[in-house]
Amino acid sequence: MRIASISTGFIEVPKEITLNIYAQGCKLRCEGCHNAQIRDFDGGEELSVEAMAKLLNAYPMVTCVCWLGGDATYQPEELCKFNTLFKKMNLSVALYTGRVFSDVYDLLKDVDLVIDGEWKGIPVTDATSNQKVYKRYAELWKNISWEELKEEGPR
């Protein structure tokens, strides 16, 4: 999978210690994009599932993996393979995508949390944002507020 960068964080997913993976490439051209420099699908570096497993073993405190971008949904086969690994490692999986939930639904088998919608300058933490938060409850998905997510966490 083409990856632009990887970092750790505590903000992107409430109540989790997160390994943030910035997927390389995005077809959307959101005005004010935070990461316009990683839109090109040919940039970044190729990372295998095996290499990711080794990397995660070096971060034993991580409880969640969060896909940011770029947009990982434009690498669907690789995204699903990585997410299967993350679930086997008992990690939560969060996905930020500029696409809408219904368009990426088939990619969500091993995902716990989705933040969807193009960036329009208002963060998902603001109730007036166009972006939506979807949380998995067993086999059902529910659209919740950021405040609810802060209370409940992604699991």
What are these regions (language model features)?
Residues D40-A53, T73-L113:
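Canonical radical SAM enzyme core domain
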Residues Y22-R29:
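Short pre-active-site segment immediately N-terminal to redox-active cysteine/selenocysteine motifs
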Residues Q24, G70, G98:
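Cofactor-binding loop segments of dinucleotide-utilizing enzymes, especially the Rossmann-like FAD-
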Residues L108-R155:
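Classical nucleotidyltransferase
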Residues I38, G70, E118-W119:
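Flexible loop residues that form catalytic
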Residues M1-Y22, N35-F41, P154-R155:
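N-terminal [4Fe-4S]-dependent radical SAM core
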Residues V62-K81, L85, Q131, Y137:
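Conserved glycine-rich "GG(E/T)P / GGGxP" loop and the immediately following alpha-helix
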Residues C30-I38, P60-T63:
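Short, basic/glycine-rich phosphate-binding loops at helix/coil junctions
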